[in-house]
Amino acid sequence: MTATVELAGGTSGLQHASRPRKPKIDCFYVYPTVSGQPGVNANLHIDPEETVVAQNQASRFSQTCRVFAPMYRQLTTTGILGKPTKAQQALAYKGVLAAWHDYLKHSNKHRGVVLIGHSQGAFVLDRLVKTEVDRRPAERKRLVSALLIGGNIQVPVGKTVGGDFKHVPACTRGSQIGCVVGYSTFDTTPPANALFGIGTATRQILCVNPASLRI
């Protein structure tokens, strides 16, 4: 897939993604809220919305890894704007959890894996890391990194570990593995009632700029 890349100095250029024959790692991608289906939870029919967002967000990673992008019964745009029950929220997570277990059992084969999620995908993967990866040394060993964008990952103020995850730290170096990149972007200062980027007195929302990480 062709992509426009913004270069230093304000110029831009086209890059064509090339897929390696034998990528050394995997990527497990969970797409954001895109379903416009009626109802609170989407069904598992692949609509154009899922295809387009997966191509736009995940295809670039195919230059480095095998991409696994499971369908799941996400909360739809209607569901997000309403008041979904805990059971409806759990239904979205249940599908991703089942896909993760299937991936580990049949496809991982002890390979390193990058977790990638945006918006609702990041929230779902936050829970997956918290309940699965963070608790299991074998799974933490496979984690290359977790890119959880717009997911309100919490850490204690001034700390890089703790909060949402007890063992998986924030990434602070480009060469670091087993860590998490998280941030939410705003074009202005977020209001006090913003859904993203607002911490508490003791916890802050993780903000790692991957472009600033140095090896």
Annotate each predicted stretch with a short phrase.
Residues 20, 29-112:
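Active-site catalytic motif of lipid deacylating hydrolases and related acyltransferases
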